[in-house]
Amino acid sequence: MDLPGPIHDFLLVFLGSGLILGGLGVVLLPNPIYSAFSLGLVLVCTSLFYILSNSHFVAAAQLLIYVGAINVLILFAVMFMNGSEYYKDFHLWTIGDGVTSMVCTSIFVSLITTIPDTSWYGIIWTTKSNQIIEQDLISNSQQIGIHLSTDFFLPFELISIILLVALIGAIAVARQ
């Protein structure tokens, strides 16, 4: 989106705080249904980030696939489980939580120290001048379709097979 600077910055901060709060909700809430709803908030905020960066197709795919299908499937699976097993012997802080928080904190600190020192200019993709003219004539969704049917044909087919196996497994579990 082409927004003025202060509005764009406000939306970035707002969506970033939504991502952080939703992520904390996924990890820290003891009720798995609330965690699944927090995951939905994280996925919606991620798709709004895609909209802010002018990737409308990726945002629509994020909403349809992850929020509309995966998160609903997670909620469906959680609602099939017995809810009483989550509240037995609930401790506020365990040794595993401490180890996990130490690992996550060390990864966070290493990222914070590494990211400012990285030269990002060499990572930006460069294209030839004739490719820029060709890319202007084709829309983003057409480019994605061309890449999926040519360059990424094998990974696309492997993902479809994995999703088919997951669907067959879900049907088998639902029948029992």
Swiss-Prot record:
This is NAD(P)H-quinone oxidoreductase subunit 6, chloroplastic. It comes from the Eukaryota. Its EC number is 7.1.1.-. It catalyses: a plastoquinone + NADH + (n+1) H(+)(in) = a plastoquinol + NAD(+) + n H(+)(out); a plastoquinone + NADPH + (n+1) H(+)(in) = a plastoquinol + NADP(+) + n H(+)(out). InterPro entries: NAD(P)H-Q_Oxidoreduct_6 (IPR050290), NADH_UbQ/plastoQ_OxRdtase_su6 (IPR001457), Nuo/plastoQ_OxRdtase_6_NuoJ (IPR042106). Belongs to the complex I subunit 6 family. One of its GO terms (molecular function) is quinone binding. The lineage of its organism: Eukaryota, Viridiplantae, Streptophyta, Embryophyta, Tracheophyta. The gene is ndhG.
